[in-house]
Every structure is written in C-alpha cells, then in structure tokens.
C-alpha cells in the first residue's frame, strides 16, 4: 500500500467504465490513509474523490479548502476567465456557463 499517490489527470480520455474503476480504486486507497495528490482540470473528478481542493492560477494558490469553499462561481470565473454559475444539490454539482 503506497503512503502517497501522485496522479496527473487520472481519468482523462477514459471511457466511463474505466473512469469509475479509477475513482473506486482512489477512494479505496484514501480509506486506507493513503495521501493522494492529483492534478486535474476536471471538476467532476474533484467532486467524486477529493476532500481538499487547492486551486492554482499562474503558479499561485487562489483557493484552498473543501469542495464547498473552493468550487464556486467567483473562483472558477477568476481561474478560467468565463462567467459561470455553480450549484451543489446534495453532492450533485452543476456548472453552467452564463452567456451575455
């Protein structure tokens, strides 16, 4: 069992069966107290696996905390430069682009 697992875009370009397999394995390791560091642009990955999120822009931390603190309209607007609306309904996240 690894003490630390470092992942870079762990489910990018995978079919859904493979994505769920990876997510399940990462969750299993997390329950065994493996520390997991993951780099990803996929918000849906973050919400299924990780309890702490650090958001970086230009190499600087712009947000750090749990999902509910970090994944919000202000942070995503700042990070990506687009206007979005973020809602969380009992763990079901929805990110909608706002078009002017």
Predicted segments, located by residue:
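Catalytic Walker B motif of ABC-type/P-loop ATPase nucleotide-binding domains
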Residues: 5-8
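ABC-family nucleotide-binding domains
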Residues: 15
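Helical segment within the ABC ATPase nucleotide-binding domain
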Residues: 20-32
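H-loop/switch region of ABC-family ATPase nucleotide-binding domains
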Residues: 40-41
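A short, surface-exposed alpha-helical micro-motif characterized by mixed small hydrophobic
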Residues: 46-48
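ABC ATPase "signature
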Residues: 64-65
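ABC ATPase nucleotide-binding domains
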Residues: 79-100
């Amino acid at each position: 069992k690894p003490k630390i697992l470092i992942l870079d875009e762990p489910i990018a370009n995978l079919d859904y069966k493979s994505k769920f397999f990876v997510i399940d394995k990462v969750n299993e390791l997390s329950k065994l107290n493996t520390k997991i560091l993951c780099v990803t642009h996929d918000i849906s990955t973050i919400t299924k696996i990780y309890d702490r999120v650090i958001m970086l822009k230009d190499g600087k931390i712009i947000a750090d905390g749990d999902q509910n603190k970090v994944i919000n309209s202000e942070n995503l607007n700042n990070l990506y430069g687009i206007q979005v609306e973020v809602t969380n309904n009992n763990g079901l996240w929805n990110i909608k682009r706002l078009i002017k």
